[in-house]
């Protein structure tokens, strides 16, 4: 059935709100963003927002459930670095660039805080009604899965490394680093971010070169 002009316009407006929400989520986290901010970013009035969504919580549900939010933040940046350097990145270079990107978010966009999702989950009321924030954190894990797969495709890490398990480890380490910085009142450092993103390898002191760990998977956890 052919859509009329009203339906087409309504769908376009809806998509504009969703796109604006994705960008605000990445740039500023979600808690400090108001309905006015979302409407302004989408190019519409606050009234237009309420035509499509009941509340900000309702909007978050649509944002997470109706749109795949894999923005490929990390691997997109690594691809860009490879194009600019006109050569393949080494494991050390890839880890440094990934840490550079995430640390810049941490420093320049404090409200975004990589783990703001996890830190705010216990108090944010939407969690009591749905699992939207859990999904938000899962999407962050998926970003790191893509990062690990990117490294594996280039044979920079051992093929037997489990992307899903290791991505959770990375997120857990980054969570701890940022939460610890709040508890101790000391800013996280670039070095700590680099360490979190370099759990795949250590240095072979005898030959002074990166030595890839045999594995980082659940299957070998108790061996």
Swiss-Prot record:
PROSITE patterns reported for this sequence: HTH_TETR_2
GO CC, alphabetical: protein-DNA complex
Name of the featured protein: Uncharacterized HTH-type transcriptional regulator YwcC
Organism (species): Bacillus subtilis (strain 168)
GO molecular function terms listed in the Swiss-Prot or TrEMBL record: DNA binding; DNA-binding transcription factor activity
SUPFAM superfamilies for the chain: Homeodomain-like, Tetracyclin repressor-like, C-terminal domain
UniProt domain HTH tetR-type: residue ranges: 11-71
DNA-binding region positions on the chain: 34-53
Highest classification ranks of the organism: Bacteria, Bacillati, Bacillota, Bacilli, Bacillales
Listed PANTHER family: ACREF/ENVCD OPERON REPRESSOR-RELATED (PTHR43479), ACREF_ENVCD OPERON REPRESSOR-RELATED (PTHR43479:SF11)
Keywords, in A-Z order: DNA-binding, Repressor, Transcription, Transcription regulation
Pfam hit, one: TetR_N
